[in-house]
């Protein structure tokens, strides 16, 4: 009796604990590698969007805490209630990013290991009510951000119901969303906090408060009669600072979530993602380049001679040989763990795809509101619809951008499998010299007002063409692994170089000499006058 009671008090023995917490106890070992590889390669690793929406799916899960906070009208005098933290599976091993987005602590709580419950972070103090003008604008902004059930979407449901048969948006609607996304990104770049949800000053002030409270009891007792008069002033200053920081964070959070949703819409073609769940529930992907995670688009027939299969479906050269599949004895546990991880990631992709397909198309009411804002700030220029000429082909199926077969052959043959050079040629073919010359590039930099400057106002390049070229370069280099894919900074540099050369009176493609960038690959002994003379007589092409 006594040994049994002692064993019950001590809990499970060491072998049992190891069996329960072993890293490979949850993973099911495969009888052979063939079914595992079939499961791994039969499913796409990227989100593939079908042109037609499938049958109605079950309703999506409730929105994360940040979405509910964004939907609460800020103009109300009562502080918005803090939503309870949603329950997550214990074995996931990932801390929910929604808690990190809505928490005001400077550092997020680390993710607990599998099998251990994660201690929920204390709820932050409710944000103070804003002033009347800011509250009205923010509440209207929240009504645009929110795409859930509510009075703000009454017209949306009716508009979406009338367009239920056709999910494709018109060119004007796409132009409105593209222009609004570009203006939101410009506002974000000009904010002092840089679009971050937390600020360093805020965290330092919180740490200083904690350090002040952490002093010993004797010191506080000695300083009590001295600091009593100062504490009231410091508390008022801290309250003012907290209010300012929370207002700043709310504005930045609204703009960032809305900009991310519009950018995701642009990347997903005809299926928009204007909801906050993608920015808050999956916040660990917020710092990743959105173009690198864009869904698969068809290239509209533009392929190079050595074309491999699409990303996520490896070619025959990357598949293992039959002899390797027969060797099941050397299949290590780490490989089994990786196979299980791949399958779990594919299941996550399928869940994301189902959520993406369940999002409604933006209704006409939202589009009219965005168009009104753009027209009020004189930022919407209706672009003439580009008519495809005979022999021209479309770069991407979702964008009205066309080039001829001769131009495509010239660009591919002269690019030397470099994505930057290909982008330079495409800019030369898609934009005219005047469009580049009288534009402010991508509109990302803060322009200083120069007095006495004459001529038309400089506006950003057509966002539809810019987005099309960006995505086409990414998709082309992804589909052709032998091509060199440029980074986001290098793509922006190519656009700015093209605008700079157009302003200097040169042809658009004259900087396509022998190097990858502006004067790269040229003889460094040659002066700029010689380079300019070469570009004038056309020898620089």
Swiss-Prot record:
Keyword check for Coiled coil: yes
Residue ranges with Acidic residues bias: 320-330
Residue stretches of biased makeup (Low complexity): 87-110
Domain of life: Eukaryota
Biased composition (Pro residues): 53-66, 111-131
Compositionally skewed regions (Polar residues) per UniProt: 304-319
Pfam families reported for this sequence: BEN
Keywords: Coiled coil
Domain named BEN: residues: 398-506
UniProt-annotated stretches for the region Disordered: 1-135, 297-330
Segments forming a coiled coil: 333-360
GO molecular function: DNA binding
Protein name in the entry: BEN domain-containing protein 4
Phylogenetic lineage: Eukaryota, Metazoa, Chordata, Craniata, Vertebrata
């Amino acid at each position: 009796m006594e040994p049994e009671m002692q064993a019950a008090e001590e809990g499970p023995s060491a072998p049992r604990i190891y069996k329960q917490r072993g890293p490979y106890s949850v993973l099911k070992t495969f009888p052979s590698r063939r079914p595992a590889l079939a499961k791994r390669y039969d499913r796409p690793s990227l989100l593939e969007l079908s042109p037609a929406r499938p049958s109605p799916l079950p309703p999506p899960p409730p929105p994360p805490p940040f979405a509910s906070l964004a939907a609460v009208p800020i103009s109300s005098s009562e502080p918005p209630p803090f939503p309870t933290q949603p329950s997550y599976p214990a074995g996931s091993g990932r801390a929910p990013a929604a808690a990190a987005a809505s928490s005001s602590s400077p550092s997020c709580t680390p993710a607990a290991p599998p099998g251990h419950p994660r201690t929920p972070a204390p709820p932050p103090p409710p944000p103070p009510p804003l002033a009347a003008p800011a509250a009205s604008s923010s509440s209207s902004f929240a009504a645009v951000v929110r795409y859930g059930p509510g009075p703000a979407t009454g017209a949306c449901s009716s508009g979406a119901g009338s367009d239920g048969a056709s999910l494709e948006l018109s060119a004007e609607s796409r132009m409105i969303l593209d222009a609004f996304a570009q203006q939101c990104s410009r506002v974000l770049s000009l904010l002092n906090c840089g679009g971050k949800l937390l600020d360093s000053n805020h965290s330092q002030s919180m740490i200083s408060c904690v350090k002040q409270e952490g002093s010993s009891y004797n010191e506080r007792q000695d300083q009590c009669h001295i600091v009593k008069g100062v504490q009231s002033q410091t508390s008022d200053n801290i309250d003012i600072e907290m209010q300012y920081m929370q207002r700043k964070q709310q504005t930045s959070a609204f703009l960032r979530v809305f900009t991310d949703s519009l950018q995701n819409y642009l990347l997903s073609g005809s299926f928009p993602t204007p909801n906050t769940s993608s920015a808050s529930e999956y916040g660990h992907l917020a710092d990743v380049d959105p173009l690198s995670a864009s869904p698969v688009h068809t290239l509209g027939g533009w392929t190079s001679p050595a074309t491999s299969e699409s990303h996520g479906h490896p070619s025959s050269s990357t598949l293992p040989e039959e002899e390797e599949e027969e060797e099941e004895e050397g299949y290590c546990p780490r490989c089994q763990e990786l196979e299980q991880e791949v399958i779990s990631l594919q299941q996550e992709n399928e869940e994301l795809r189902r959520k993406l397909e369940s999002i409604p198309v933006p209704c006409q009411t939202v589009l009219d509101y965005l168009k009104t804002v753009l027209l009020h700030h004189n930022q919407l220029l209706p672009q003439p619809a580009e008519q495809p000429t005979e022999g021209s082909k479309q770069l991407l199926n979702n964008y009205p951008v066309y080039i001829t077969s001769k131009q495509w052959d010239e660009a591919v043959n002269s690019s030397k499998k470099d994505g930057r050079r290909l982008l330079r040629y495409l800019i030369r073919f898609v934009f005219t010299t005047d469009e580049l010359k009288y534009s402010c590039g991508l509109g990302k930099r803060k322009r200083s007002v120069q007095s006495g400057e004459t001529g038309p106002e400089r506006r950003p390049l057509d966002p539809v063409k810019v987005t099309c070229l960006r995505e086409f370069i990414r998709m082309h280099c992804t589909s052709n692994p032998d091509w060199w894919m440029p980074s986001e900074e290098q793509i922006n540099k190519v656009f700015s170089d093209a605008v700079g050369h157009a302003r200097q009176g040169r042809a658009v493609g004259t900087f396509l000499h022998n190097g990858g960038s502006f004067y790269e690959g040229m003889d460094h002994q040659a002066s700029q006058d010689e380079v300019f003379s070469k570009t004038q007589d056309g020898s620089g092409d």
